């Protein structure tokens, strides 16, 4: 069964809600409560979870720590992922200082082509030249945060693929051409702002999208 992309996004939301509930000392929850907090229906919660198995007990609900653990497993957060940043300009540097990667993601490399940046200390490491990617990626780094200019994005992606990267979080406003076995997630701020402008001008569409 194919899992809709929107369902994965909602699972992430459910997980964050469960983490909040656990922090508040809540031991049990229900699809109704999760749905209310996630702004979706209880039916949608149950449907999203059903893609991956049977969770909870009818009339009893879900045990918060158990469902949290199951969602972390589904989303691949029960392990440590090695990250690198390629492109140490303003955005890359800001991401290097970001404290919220959590326990499942660890920055293990920083890369650029600018000789003035290479060798500069950053977050307990140093910026290295992208030519070293083939030596640094295998066995250590699975995911790259790509923060280079648009015109350099495809070449950087090619270098990452050749080095053995498994996934790319792409901040460049360009569609990358990569092998199907390499996962790509695009972060496009302008596209997000454009969706917001459309949603503001079309409130009925926004209400339908929110269920």
Swiss-Prot record:
Keyword line: Cytoplasm, DNA-binding, NAD, Repressor, Transcription, Transcription regulation
Annotated positions binding NAD(+): 87-92
UniProt feature coiled coil, ranges: none
One GO biological process term: response to redox state
Signal peptide: none
Alphabetized Gene3D superfamilies for the sequence: NAD(P)-binding Rossmann-like Domain, Winged helix-like DNA-binding domain superfamily/Winged helix DNA-binding domain
DNA-binding region coordinates: 13-52
Subcellular location: Cytoplasm
InterPro entries tied to this protein: CoA-bd (IPR003781), NAD(P)-bd_dom_sf (IPR036291), Rex_DNA-bd_C_dom (IPR009718), Tscrpt_rep_Rex (IPR022876), WH-like_DNA-bd_sf (IPR036388), WH_DNA-bd_sf (IPR036390)
Molecular function terms from GO: DNA binding; DNA-binding transcription factor activity; identical protein binding
Cellular compartments per GO CC: cytoplasm
Similarity field: Belongs to the transcriptional regulatory Rex family.
Subunit structure: Homodimer.
Function according to Swiss-Prot or TrEMBL: Modulates transcription in response to changes in cellular NADH/NAD(+) redox state.
Name the UniProt record assigns to this protein: Redox-sensing transcriptional repressor Rex
Species in which this protein is naturally found: Thermus aquaticus
